[in-house]
């Protein structure tokens, strides 16, 4: 059976759109140019406690070792920006918890993996014999360099992939295949001299163009770090209890980003009320029930309370907050450290964070639809 691979590649992109992906590109598996930078980043310890990154090392840059026989990677993008994102209104109210917008709906891993699997099955029907494997970011693979190579966008200074139409509000997934599909052309970097993301990072986690010290990043601190959050970062976290979107919010390319068509990525009803005290009152069973099917669930109840306690410490003085914090003392040793800090903070006069106020003004001016 003779296969027209160019025609097949065109069809793959059509099928992917039918499965809910907004854009698809194809590349080869050579990521050798990224291996040295990856090793340097790991040696510097910028990955923090994410030991799995160091364990897999340069294998992350070798897709053909993850799935032997792989010669092409189909990289796919799925937009997640929810309607009525309410960025500015949320950040302006210190008594409301801020949750990164990618996590407001259902966990994307399973959904995207399932759609990639369906894409693989569709391709298999056409070529009769196909070796393939879907990956979403939980797997040890350098998905951003692959997506960049496949023409899905360019890497911003915040290390996220950027597309002219979608900004950076999207998930990535990969389908590794063993057929010689024609590859796509990378796009030109459009960031220019802009450094908005670097100057707006609350904790100065963006060290230089594309280099992130995860140990300083609020997303890492609230999600990947299960231990004690260093005191130097707590007040800078504000009301961000799960992730951080600041570097995306100031990016000019995100001003016209499209709203997701995937209803599963819309805000879940259990997060309709993000009042800090209300969320802090959830016991473990309530947390597990309300976060079923959510990416937030995997951090666990104690880490959820830890993050909330910091936000409560950063909120305006309130006897109700102090009482709620005191009621949780004794539940967990590490949690107590953060609660005691928060109680102490509540007794101080909280001054406005100038960088955060600037961020809110930028959102209201540049992202009025999503403010």
Swiss-Prot record:
UniProt keyword 4Fe-4S, yes or no: yes
Source species: Aliivibrio fischeri (strain ATCC 700601 / ES114)
Primary localization: cytoplasm
Active site: 137
Pfam families to which the protein is assigned, alphabetical: Fer4_16, QueG_DUF1730
Sorted UniProt keywords: 4Fe-4S, Cytoplasm, Iron, Iron-sulfur, Metal-binding, Oxidoreductase, Queuosine biosynthesis, tRNA processing
InterPro entries: 4Fe4S_Fe-S-bd (IPR017896), 4Fe4S_Fe_S_CS (IPR017900), QueG (IPR004453), QueG_DUF1730 (IPR013542)
Gene Ontology MF, one: 4 iron, 4 sulfur cluster binding
Protein name, entry field: Epoxyqueuosine reductase
Alphabetical GO biological process terms: queuosine biosynthetic process; tRNA modification
């Amino acid at each position: 059976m003779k296969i027209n691979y160019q025609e097949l590649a065109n069809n793959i992109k059509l099928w992917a759109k039918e499965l809910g992906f907004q854009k698809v590109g194809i590349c080869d598996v050579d990521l050798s140019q990224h291996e040295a930078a990856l090793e340097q980043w790991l040696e510097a310890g910028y990955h923090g406690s994410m030991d799995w990154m160091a364990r897999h090392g340069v294998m992350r840059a070798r897709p053909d070792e993850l799935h032997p026989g792989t010669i092409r990677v189909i990289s796919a993008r799925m937009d997640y920006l929810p309607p009525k994102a309410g960025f500015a209104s949320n950040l302006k109210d210190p008594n409301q918890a801020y949750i990164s917008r990618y996590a407001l709906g259902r966990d994307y891993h399973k959904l995207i993996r399932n759609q990639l699997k369906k894409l693989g099955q569709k391709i298999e029907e056409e070529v009769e014999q196909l070796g393939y494997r879907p990956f979403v970011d939980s797997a040890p693979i350098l998905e951003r360099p692959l997506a960049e190579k496949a023409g899905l966008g360019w890497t911003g200074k915040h290390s996220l992939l950027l597309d002219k139409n979608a900004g950076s509000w999207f998930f990535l997934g990969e389908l590794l295949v063993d057929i010689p599909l024609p590859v796509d052309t990378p796009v030109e970097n459009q960031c220019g001299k802009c450094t908005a993301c670097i100057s707006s990072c609350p904790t100065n986690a963006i060290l230089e163009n594309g280099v992130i010290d995860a140990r300083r990043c609020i997303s890492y601190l609230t999600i990947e770090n299960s231990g004690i959050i260093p005191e130097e970062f707590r007040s800078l976290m504000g009301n961000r209890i799960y992730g951080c979107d600041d570097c995306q919010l100031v990016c000019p390319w995100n001003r016209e980003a499209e709203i997701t068509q995937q209803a599963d990525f819309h805000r879940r009803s259990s997060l309709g009320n993000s009042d800090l005290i209300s969320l802090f009152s959830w016991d473990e069973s309530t947390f597990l029930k309300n976060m079923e099917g959510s990416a937030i669930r995997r951090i666990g109840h104690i880490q959820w309370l830890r993050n909330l306690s910091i936000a409560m410490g950063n909120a305006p003085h309130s006897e109700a907050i102090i009482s709620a914090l005191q009621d949780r003392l004794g539940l967990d040793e590490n949690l107590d450290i953060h609660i005691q800090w928060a109680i102490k903070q509540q007794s101080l006069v909280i001054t406005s964070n100038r960088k955060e106020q600037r961020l809110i003004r930028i959102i209201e001016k540049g992202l009025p639809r999503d403010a």
